[in-house]
Amino acid sequence: MNKILILLLLVSAVLTSHDQVVAVTIKPNLYNINSAPLYFEKFISQYNKQYSSEDEKKYRYNIFRHNIESINAKNSRNDSAVYKINRFADMTKNEVVNRHTGLASGDIGANFCETIVVDGPGQRQRPANFDWRNYNKVTSVKDQGMCGACWAFAGLGALESQYAIKYDRLIDLAEQQLVDCDFVDMGCDGGLIHTAYEQIMHIGGVEQEYDYPYKAVRLPCAVKPHKFAVGVRNCYRYVLLSEERLEDLLRHVGPIAIAVDAVDLTDYYGGVISFCENNGLNHAVLLVGYGIENNVPYWTIKNSWGSDYGENGYVRIRRGVNSCGMINELASSAQIA
C-alpha cells in the first residue's frame, strides 16, 4: 500500500475541461558538469552523431558542455518548464535557427491574402482551456530535418486542420511540393506562410504527402495536378495585437500558423516556458490550443522538430506576455476550396 501511495504522489496528473490528461511538471536533477564527457558519449550514441575529425568532436563537446550549463541555469530558475539534453545539444543556438527553422526575414511584401487586424478584448464567456487535438483536427507531428521549411510545415498544418474541420478526416499534405514548386519562397532557405498560400492558389492545389514525399532538400518541381487533394480559396494574414482576441480567433477559425523566435525553444522538454525572448522572428509553428496549468496560462504549439522533441512534438509557452514574440503580423490561415 505504501508503494502505491508513493507512486501516486510521484506520478500525478491534472485534467483539463476537455478531460485531456496533462502531466504535472516535475523539475529534474541538475546535470553534473564534471560528468559532461560521459553525458556527451551517451548523447553521441543515442542520436547516432558522427563527426569528421577529433577536432570537430572536441569543438562539439565544448558546445555541448556550454549547453548543459545553460540547461542547468534554466532549470534552476523559477520557471514552469523543464529543459533537457536533446538532439540539438551539440549545436549553437544560431546553428539550430539556421538549419532547423526557416521563416524568412525582411519585408512582408504584397500578396493576395486579406489582412485582418486582431485587436480588442476577448469574448466575455470563453472556455479556460481549448485544444483542437481534443476534436481530432490536428495531424501528426512531422520533422522538417535540416531544411528551412518551417513555413511550409506550419502553413500546411493549418490547411490539414481546415480539411479535418470541413470533412472530419485527417490527411497529410506535401510540404515537399512547396519546397520544390513555390518559386516566391526559397525552399529550404526560408519562406513566409501567407506567400505559400498565394503560391498554392497560383499552382492550383497541393498534393498529399504519400504522392509527393518529403526529402528535406529542394528538388526540381514534379507537381501532378491530377493528384491535388486540397486547394486554397482565400487566405488571411493576421496583424496580432491582442492575445485575448487570438483565443477567440483560434476557436472560431481553427489552428493558425504563427511566427516566433525559436532560440529559447531549442532545449525544451516539457511544461510551460515562462521566459521566451524575442530577438527576431525566425520560425513558423502551428497554434492549436491554450489552457492553464498550476495557475500559469499557456499556448499550445505544434512544432516541426519530430515527435521526440518537447511534449511529443509540442511546446507550451506562457500566454498573455507576448512569449517568443508571437504577437506580430505574420500569423496566417486559409480557407480551403
From Swiss-Prot:
Gene Ontology annotations of biological process type: proteolysis
Propeptide section residues: 17-126
Keywords of the record: Disulfide bond, Hydrolase, Protease, Signal, Thiol protease, Zymogen
Recorded GO MF terms: cysteine-type peptidase activity
EC number: 3.4.22.50
Pfam families: Inhibitor_I29, Peptidase_C1
Residue numbers annotated as active site: C150, H283, N303
Superkingdom of origin: Viruses
Disulfide bonds: C147-C188, C181-C221, C276-C324
Top-level class of the enzyme under EC nomenclature: hydrolase
Post-translational changes noted in the entry: Synthesized as an inactive proenzyme and activated by proteolytic removal of the inhibitory propeptide.
Signal peptide range: 1-16
Catalytic activity as recorded in UniProt: Endopeptidase of broad specificity, hydrolyzing substrates of both cathepsin L and cathepsin B
Functional description taken from the UniProt entry: Cysteine protease that plays an essential role in host liquefaction to facilitate horizontal transmission of the virus. May participate in the degradation of foreign protein expressed by the baculovirus system.
Family: Belongs to the peptidase C1 family.
Name of the featured protein: Viral cathepsin
The species this protein was found in: Mamestra configurata nucleopolyhedrovirus (MacoNPV)
Gene name per UniProt: VCATH
